[in-house]
Amino acid sequence: MADITIGVVVFPGSNCDHDTMHAVASFEGVKPVMLWHGSHDLQGAKAIILPGGFSYGDYLRAGSIARFSPIMQEVVDAAGKGLPVLGICNGFQVLLESGLLDGALSRNRDKKFLCRDTYIRPVNSNTMFTGLYREDEVLSIPIAHGEGNYFAPPEVIESLEEHDQVVFRYTDREGHVSDEANPNGSVGNIAGIMNRNGNVLGLMPHPERASEKLLGSEDGRRLFASLFRQL
């Protein structure tokens, strides 16, 4: 049986593509391939990952130029047909700019770049990305971003909550949602959301940086495992 192909998109300025490739390659029966930003070829990928970094130098606005790349034209079209797409950090920003997810990400409330471990809780374990998590567990997964402050109009937030599209929230070590546990000011402590169809997920924390013991946490590994078992 052939390995399942997972496409990892590479933009100019991506810097987590190799980390993501390494995490994906650690799963048996899964083969990561790099998808260059200037290509229209998804290479038969059964899922797409948009990794972290600073696509196109984050000029104008994080993710705003990447949305116009040839590869994103194909990703948007494929996502509309049900292809699973995961956006991590800058990848989340690209998903928002591309219209695959609702809302926007602005500068962190303290206007500083944040790079540290943080705690998040899966608040919806009934998705293709979170099926191996429990909703009462607390995950230790690092963040590294300057524009991670998620916001959207009240009616969008209400719709996200109503349709269980909020997937992760920032919490403290005990799993309590509070302003003190919110690293960047995101409305409702939102760390990750998905689309209405459930095949597109964006989150600011980096699961690929919490995917093996050597990194200090394996809490992010089950996100990839949850996705791959659905393919």
UniProtKB/Swiss-Prot annotation:
It is found in: Cytoplasm. One of its GO terms (biological process) is 'de novo' IMP biosynthetic process. Gene3D superfamilies: 3.40.50.880. GO terms for cellular component: cytoplasm. Signal peptide: none annotated. The keyword Iron does not apply. It holds the Pfam family GATase_5. Pathway: Purine metabolism; IMP biosynthesis via de novo pathway; 5-amino-1-(5-phospho-D-ribosyl)imidazole from N(2)-formyl-N(1)-(5-phospho-D-ribosyl)glycinamide: step 1/2. Residues 7-231 form the Glutamine amidotransferase type-1 domain. The active site is at C89 (nucleophile), H206, E208. Its EC number is 6.3.5.3, 3.5.1.2. Keywords: ATP-binding, Cytoplasm, Glutamine amidotransferase, Hydrolase, Ligase, Nucleotide-binding, Purine biosynthesis. GO terms for molecular function: ATP binding; glutaminase activity; phosphoribosylformylglycinamidine synthase activity. It catalyses: N(2)-formyl-N(1)-(5-phospho-beta-D-ribosyl)glycinamide + L-glutamine + ATP + H2O = 2-formamido-N(1)-(5-O-phospho-beta-D-ribosyl)acetamidine + L-glutamate + ADP + phosphate + H(+); L-glutamine + H2O = L-glutamate + NH4(+). PROSITE patterns: GATASE_TYPE_1. InterPro entries: Class_I_gatase-like, PRibForGlyAmidine_synth_PurQ. Its main location: cytoplasm. NCBIfam families: FGAM_synth_I, PRK03619.1. Part of the FGAM synthase complex composed of 1 PurL, 1 PurQ and 2 PurS subunits. Part of the phosphoribosylformylglycinamidine synthase complex involved in the purines biosynthetic pathway. Catalyzes the ATP-dependent conversion of formylglycinamide ribonucleotide (FGAR) and glutamine to yield formylglycinamidine ribonucleotide (FGAM) and glutamate. The FGAM synthase complex is composed of three subunits. PurQ produces an ammonia molecule by converting glutamine to glutamate. PurL transfers the ammonia molecule to FGAR to form FGAM in an ATP-dependent manner. This is Phosphoribosylformylglycinamidine synthase subunit PurQ. It comes from Chlorobium luteolum (strain DSM 273 / BCRC 81028 / 2530). The lineage of its organism: Bacteria, Pseudomonadati, Chlorobiota, Chlorobiia, Chlorobiales.
